[in-house]
Each structure stands twice: as structure tokens, then as C-alpha cells.
């Protein structure tokens, strides 16, 4: 094409105007290429529309009703044609019938199923009109419509004898598809309201080409190249290829990329070394396994390689296991060889691939070994022998054995045996049912279809119409296995429905359907469930083992803690409980009953009822006496009234709680604890029943010996008794009982010893009576014996000088003594008041009546001194425990108990303060609003509190009056709290007063100073020892010298071995500095903060450690020191080397900076030059033992006139007091 003929569209094919013109031309071509059928349909629609829109009236009908009448007539004519179709069907196929007029009986003009050029005889059946072709109700057809329809039919109908169009061509051109129906007449909406008419429907017909949708963008030329519209997105028919996301273990739930590969294709005889060399070039191998046959040990030519993560691989960066496996897989796909064979590599994520390959290789070797095995001397089976015999039902001919002779056997030479390879049997030996898990299957038992290998292919062909996955068989039958999905289950049911009980050759397939897999299969638990069960099992086993260990430990602990004393204590407690119940019955219940049955209490009642008084009243063996301030009832008041006419009667004026006391020696339960030197009491008479004891009568003239058990006093002195057997109340009770027995027998039998022993009891009671109204009974044996001796002296002096008025006073005293012995501890204070009054009266009478007798005066002085001593002892014992005084005050209201405010309110303090239920209720009321604290077991908490108190205050038991604290540890603050004091620096001298380790050093120092003052000789010896310690660095031991000589010899040998260089000495000295370092550690120091301690024994003059830090100039060191002080760093570690250089180890340094100062140090600091630089090294001044703190002298310049001197805290014997 020349340049002149080329146009704008040729040079610019993508211009918008050119594209628009091409689009217009393509649209016109599509319109021209439309099929002729559309035009024909258009003509038909035009004809029908023209007939419907004509304004003529047929049979008087309006134009609106014309269409409805035409449709009715058309339906009527079609019905008539259908009735006469059988008679006219044979004639309709001839040309004469096609040209017959309307007057004949032909119905060609009304047949609508006549073939057209677009249909054939196979398109659709005849005489099947649609619902829209029903007969009209009136049976008439308009002439105009019949004429038009005839014209249309004549122009469009084609006779049957016309050569038909080929079927394939007509189907490819147009295929009619009925999409649905359209309602054209609805009787419900018609204006005629004629409900007899039926609704009319018209089919909606469309062809395949019209129903097929096409992409309108494809009609645009070069649309895929972006020529349609440059502003729109380019059409991309292929999907995008996205980048593969790398594996991230933090956000990935599933398994990670494979780290194991399996290699095949190499020679099985290839050694493992070349395989390992090849695959180790991709990454670090964790495991390599060349598979072998487990039976024969032959290599299978299958090798699995597993990689692991490596931090550094061949000097490069880290390589992960998955990346190594990936590189090996892609590299080996390019054709890697091992030897002369090309290998094949596959991923093996879980080892399943290698297992499958190994199992296949092993099975193939088994088959090859069976084929290659020669058959020698194998007996023929019975089936082979009888293979050529006729069937058993065949007729038998005459026997010819008698006429047959054995033919001679012709010898044959050796010949090769050509054996066909045995076909592997398709019948599996392993049961298939156990291998099927959840796969749907159909089972055919072997009893219905015999299990043969040849039957399996025929069964597969028989079931080829179904989508099965595999068909397998074993000795039990056939298994038709489908895929494990919903579709597989449906296919299983469909196969069972169509093939169950059907024939397979001559057998019937009796099937058993299992659409949900093996019903007896138990699903293995998931990994999470297995891990959970394993964890639970491990936890249960652990708890069980711990319980068993606890039981064994408890058994061992019980065996160790088994104490016979504990068991004895339990037995004693049980016996005491039983004894207490017996005492309650005998001492409380029985006396209360006797008191209630006393006849005197019911005198008024007897008078009211007219009952006479009993003839005699016997006092029971139990005494229920009452003490009061004015009177003391006594059962033997008749003897006292004879001697005291003015004595008061035994009536109870002020009632109090009774004292219940058994008669003397009625209880023999404690005979084992009595002194064997005492006289044994006589055998008591039998006790009569209670009723007789209450009602028995006695004469006044009966002697006391008949009514009471004979008593005998103990004549042994109390000094002769063992002290351990004298109780706190035994003496007073014995004295009271002796006095009561003496009064029972006769008042005349009282001698001087008894009277003066009663005076001693009264004096002891006076001593017990404290001004604070709190009593503490003190019955100490030595004091009591001392008082008895004084009473004996008083009796000896004043025996011949007494007058008759003394017995009167003594009777009153005796009356108080008896009351003292018979009354209970609850009213002991009132008894003491009464006895005090009697004692004062007795002393005054003695003073006034016998003032001229020196013996009595002497005894009075002794009594007063003894009373003062007892009062002091009582006051001292009173402080130990405050007891409640349950009685009525006589002179003024007094508190029951006086609380001591100095008692520390810990657990023991609260137990001492709370006396009764009332105090406990008050305490509950106070603590109601306080929040409740959880303390767990109350007994354990109380025991723990008392154990803490015992640790803090050893030896203190019970209430204390001083809190547990360390003297000087808690420093008071002016503002009340350390937080409100603000920030201030605490001096080291103050820290030494309250820090525990400083207090320890301070105490050691004070003890040393006190010892030096008390013993000057030891002080001088200590000073000499300190002086020797200072000079010990000048001399060394023999072993140290030997070690030093050996070290020097080693250094000289190293010098000779090294080449001659100028810096050898510095290098050797630096090596010495590193080699000779001693093991040390830092810990809390008693001198100051942290300290350095030796971990081994260090000899004198040995190097210990180097003082390491940052080397700075003097000006920088001064600036840093000021900065450290401003920032609050209390300790700065600056060590001066020379005038211009300072080592700063405050923030950058070794542990040598923790060495503290001491006025008598065990180390020293030396400056040596190593490698041209000065170093600070710490040496030992003397032999240092293990765990001893290292110290050296800081050697600060002495500042005599300075006000800010640094105190020394070393605490040594030669301490100077200050560092500067």
C-alpha cells in the first residue's frame, strides 16, 4: 500500500475518532447478519396487529372485542381438528388434500402442527396443542380471521413431501426453548364477568442464541488492548499472581513449611558420605536416614534428610531449616546427580512420603524374590492332577486297565524351565475392615459372590456408572469404597439402591451399605485432647506421688516425734477429767442437795402444814459454812458459847458462796502421794444409805468418838517433810483441819503450839493483804517454817505469863482461823479483813497488858519484821498476775481489778486484760466496726505470735511492760516521721549507732576498751601484738620464700624461651598481674557499706587484686568529686596515682574499690609500672585468713583544725578516731 492510499486510521489506529468509526461499522454489520426468522416473526406480528387494529365491526362486535373473539374461534377450530384428526390424518400427507377447498372435510387450514422449514418430524409430536389453542366457547370463527389465517398458513406452511432440511443444520440454526407462559385472558378481570370462561395462556418461546448472554465489551475492537476507553481499567482476563507470604510462627496456626526431604533414584549401594556431602551444602543436617529392608538389611535407595536451624552457616548469616529444605528441593530439580544416577527429591513433611516409598520398595522386593525362587521337588496339587479328568457327571466307558500295559519311560535330558511370572494376587491378607475408618463403603460377602482375583475387574466394569474410589477384596468379601464426603455418601446410597440384589454373572450381589464408614471404628483423639489427657494423667500421678511421699514423710516424722511423755500426758488428762467429774458430783452436787434438804430450811413450811419437827438432826459429813464480816457459823458452837457467852449465833446474816469441803481423810485416792512416815488412819466404818444418814437420831450424851472417825494429829515437824511434797495450800488446810478436829473433840485439848501456829497463819494472811486490795497467796515453805519457829519461841517465852483474857482473844482468832480454813477462795479477801482486825486487836492487847515483858516485845518486833518481809514478797508476786476480787467492798466502792497501763498490748497483754465474759463483750463491741483480717487458723496464728515474741525477747513469758526493740536503732524525728524531714545526709557516725552490724562492732570495741581498763597487762600484750602485725610485712615465712623463688625461676625460663625484644619485661609483669590475682568476694561490711573478703588463705606480700578504674586528670577528678556530692552519691572512689593522674572507680571500676579503711590494716596499696603505665595493686601485709575482710590505710592527710573531719569506723584496737 502506497503512502498516498494510506489514511488517518492506518497511521493512528488507536485514535478516538477511528475507534468510534470502527465501532459504528461493527454495529451495522451485526444488524445485517441477524437471522431471517426475526423478520418473519415481525411480519406475523404485523399481520396480527393489523387485523386487531382494524376499525371494522364483525357481527356487531366492537373493535376492542375482536381479538378476544378471534382467539375463541381459533381454539374452537383446533378442538374440532383434534376430534377429526384420526379420519383425516392419512389424507393430510397428500398434495391433493393440501389444495382442497374449504368446503371439503379437510382440516389443513386449521392445522397448526404442520412442519415448517425450521422444523422436522422429530421436533415435537403432533396434535399436541398448547393451552392457548383451546376451542372457542361459541364454536364460530370470524371470516376475516379465517381468511388471514389461511393466507398466513399458505405462505408459511410446507408440505411433508418437501425435501426436509438436515437435522444438524436446523438445530444449529435455531433451537426453540419455552421459558414459561403468559396469561392473555383472565376471567376475573374481564369486563363481561363471565366466570365460565377459562383463563388463556401463551407460551414464551425464545431460541438458544437469544438466551445466551455475551460480554458487550468483546464487541469493541481492540478492547483488550485498552483501545475502548483509556480512562477505564484495562481488561484483565487472567487472575493476578500474588506474592507468596512467608511463614510466620507467631501468626500461623497450621504446620510450618517442611524441613525434611526424601531422596530417591540413586544407587542403593552408594555410601552415605556423598549423599551427606551434597545435602549438607544447603544447610545444617539434623538427621539423615538411609532406609533399609528390615528383614534382609538391604539398602532400598531411599534416603530422608532432615534439616535444623543454624545460627551461622559457612560463615554467612543464619539459615533456617525450612529454607535449607527449600534450597535442596529446587536445586535437585535441576538435575543433580549422585554418581551416575540422577536423583529425585520430594518434600517429606511428616515422614509419610518416605514411609510409603519404603513400603513400596519392600513389597516390590518381596515379589521379585518370590518370582526368582526356583520350584524344585514341589508336589503337584490335587487340582493340577485332576485338571484333565472329565466331570463327575460324565458317562463312564468300559474299563481298559486290564488290557493296558505300562509304557516304557523315555529318559529325557536336562532342559530349561520357562516359568511365567506369577501374577500378584489382588486378594489382601490383611483385613480391610480395620483399615477403613470414615470412608463410605458397600460390602458384598464372600458367601454371595466368591472371592476371586479374576472377579475384581468385572465388578469394577459392572459398577462403572458409579463414582467409587476403590474396590478391594479380602477373604471375607468385596469392599466398594467411596470418597469421604457428602457426595460420596450420596453415591453410596445410589449404588446400593440400583445394585442391591442384582445379578453379577450368575451370582446375586447382596450388598451391605455403610455410608458413614466403619461403624466399629473408634476415632483417635485429637492432638489437643491427647495432650490434655496426658497432662491430666501426669498431674494425677504427680499428686498421687506427692501424697504418698507426704504420707511416708509424716510416718517418719511421727516416728521421730514419738514421745512417751505425750501419751502419758493424754492418759493423765483423761484420768483428771474423770476425777474432776467425780469431784463435781461429790463436792458440788451432793452438798447442794444436802443444803436443800436441811430441815431448818423447811421449818415454816412444816408449821403451815402442821408437820412436827424431826426428833434429831445430824450434821452431815459435808460442811456448808458461810463467812461474813460479823459472824462465823460453826457446827460446834455449843463449845464456844460455853466459853464466850457473848458470842454470836450461827445464823447466816450475809450470804455468800459456800465453801464445800470433805471431812478429813475420807478420800483414799491419793494415798500413794502421802508421806509414808505419817500414821495410817483407822479403817472407816461402812456408810449407810442417804435416807438413813438424813434421818438418823443421836442423843446429846453420845460421845464424839461414836459419831466421828478417830483422828490423830501428825506429830512430825514440817521441817522433816520432803519439800517437794509440800503444796501451796497443804499447810493451811492441814492447820485448819487440825483446828477443826481439836474443836470437835474438846477445846481443852488446844495447846500452846497450836495457838501460836494459828497466830502465824493470821500474820501470813495479814502479809498477803495488800493496800491495793489484790491478794496473792504465798505459802512458801521456808517462810512458813520460819514463822512456826518464831511462834515456838514466843510460846516458850510467854508460857507462864499469860492471863485468862488471852484465850478469849485466841478463841476469836481461832474462830477466824477456822473460818479461814473452811471458806472458799472467792471470799478470802473479806476473811483477811476480819483476821487483820483480830490481829491488830491481839497486838494492841499484848502491847498494853504485857508491855513490861521483854520476851513478848522481842517476839513482837520479830513478828513485825517478818510481816514486812512477807508484804514485800507479796507485792513482788502481785505484779506477776492481777486477779479479780469478787467480793463486796466494806468501806468504799472499789474496782474489781485495776488495769496496768504499762503492759504491752500484745497477745499476752490482751489475755491478761480480758478477765471475764463482760470484758470480752466490751472488746467485741469496740472491734465491730473494724475491718476483719484473714489470719487462717487461729491457734496456729497465736502460736506463731508467741514464737516471734520468744525469739525477740528470749526468756520473757507472759505480759511484758517494755516493747521489744534494739536500743539506739530507732532514731526519733523532730517532725514525727522521716518522710517529713526532707532529704538530708546521715553521717556515718550516726549510722554506727543504729545499724545492727555497726552496733556489733561498737559493742566489741566497748568490750575491748573495758577489758583493757580492767586488765592493763592484757592491754599491753595486745598493743605488742598490733605492733608486731605492722612489722610482719618486713619478714616472710620460709614457705613464701620458696614459692617466690620458684616463681622467679619460671619467669626466667620464660624470658629465655621468648625472643629478645625490648618489651618483654612489661609483658611478663602484666602476665604476673593477671596470674597472681587472688579469689575475693564482696559482701556487707561491719565497717562501712560493702567490703571485700578473702575466699582463700593469703600469705604475706602476695598480690591480691588490682585497683581498676577510669584514669583521669586531676582537674577532671576535682570536677567529678563536686558533681558526685551534688548528685547525692555519698561514696566516691578516687585513688590518686601521682600529682596529675587519678583513678576514678565510682562508675567504672572493679570490686577493689570496696576495700574499706582500717587503722590497723592487713593490706597495702602499691603503684607499679606495667607496659609503660602505672597500675595500683593491693598486696597483703600479713597472713590473711579465709573470710577475713581486706582493709588498708587510706592515708588521708591529717587535718587538726578542720571542723569537717571524717570519723573512723574500723573499730580496731589501734583506731585513731578519724581518717583525716
Curated annotation (Swiss-Prot):
Ranges of residues in domain SET: 1078-1195
Catalytic activity: L-lysyl(4)-[histone H3] + 3 S-adenosyl-L-methionine = N(6),N(6),N(6)-trimethyl-L-lysyl(4)-[histone H3] + 3 S-adenosyl-L-homocysteine + 3 H(+); N(6)-methyl-L-lysyl(4)-[histone H3] + S-adenosyl-L-methionine = N(6),N(6)-dimethyl-L-lysyl(4)-[histone H3] + S-adenosyl-L-homocysteine + H(+); N(6),N(6)-dimethyl-L-lysyl(4)-[histone H3] + S-adenosyl-L-methionine = N(6),N(6),N(6)-trimethyl-L-lysyl(4)-[histone H3] + S-adenosyl-L-homocysteine + H(+)
PROSITE patterns (alphabetical): POST_SET, SAM_MT43_1, SET
Biased composition (Low complexity): 123-133
Any GO BP annotation: methylation
Residues annotated as binding S-adenosyl-L-methionine: 1194
Residue ranges of the motif RxxxRR motif: 1041-1046
Domain of life: Eukaryota
Database matches in InterPro entries: COMPASS_Set1_N-SET (IPR024657), Nucleotide-bd_a/b_plait_sf (IPR012677), Post-SET_dom (IPR003616), RBD_domain_sf (IPR035979), Set1-like (IPR044570), Set1_fungi (IPR017111), SET_assoc (IPR024636), SET_dom (IPR001214)
Compartments in which it is found: Nucleus; Chromosome
The UniProt record lists the keyword S-adenosyl-L-methionine: yes
One term under GO cellular component: Set1C/COMPASS complex
Chain ranges of the Post-SET domain: 1204-1220
Basic and acidic residues composition bias: residue spans: 26-44, 70-82, 183-193, 520-542, 697-722, 746-759
Keyword annotations of the record: Chromatin regulator, Chromosome, Methyltransferase, Nucleus, S-adenosyl-L-methionine, Transferase
Function: Catalytic component of the COMPASS (Set1C) complex that specifically mono-, di- and trimethylates histone H3 to form H3K4me1/2/3. Binds RNAs which might negatively affect its histone methyltransferase activity. COMPASS recognizes ubiquitinated H2B on one face of the nucleosome which stimulates the methylation of H3 on the opposing face.
Domain notes from UniProt: The RxxxRR motif forms an adapter helix that bridges the nucleosome and ubiquitin.
Family from the record: Belongs to the class V-like SAM-binding methyltransferase superfamily.
Protein name as it appears in the record: Histone-lysine N-methyltransferase, H3 lysine-4 specific
Organism: Emericella nidulans (strain FGSC A4 / ATCC 38163 / CBS 112.46 / NRRL 194 / M139)
